[in-house]
């Protein structure tokens, strides 16, 4: 999935590399914990304080999403999981030259792909990676998630 894309596209190993992860929902949590396990220095930019605190409890750095433009110059690798445009032209212009952006968010994604290209970044909209890499497992996870969501919904009534 995402880790495979990063390993294939980066010129350097993830070990010791600074990676900016946007969003810390279920996908962000899965990617973040794996990146950290591979030795990446992960900074999670999230809107909700609880998500930032959770990231910090797992050994990652937490940052306010509102500070994204100020954070950008420290990174050349970004993974986005937020399905709203957060990687705008002004933010992209502040990333290190030739940055790699892997956008996992559903269409239209969270990246201004045209602006990324103009800035000289490589931006990949990596949709449906679990289904492409491991379709049976992906189906099981989707089914389990839907069941959990239905249970939570019933419990809220």
Where are these regions (language model features)?
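Rossmann-like adenosine-cofactor binding region
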Residues: 55-131
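Accessory recognition modules or surfaces
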Residues: 1-19, 51-60, 77-79
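Glycine-rich adenosine-cofactor-binding loop
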Residues: 13-36
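Adenosine-phosphate binding glycine-rich loop
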Residues: 1-16, 107-157
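Short beta-strand/turn micro-motifs composed of small residues
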Residues: 23, 46, 105
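Conserved Rossmann-like nucleotide-cofactor binding loop
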Residues: 27, 50-51, 107
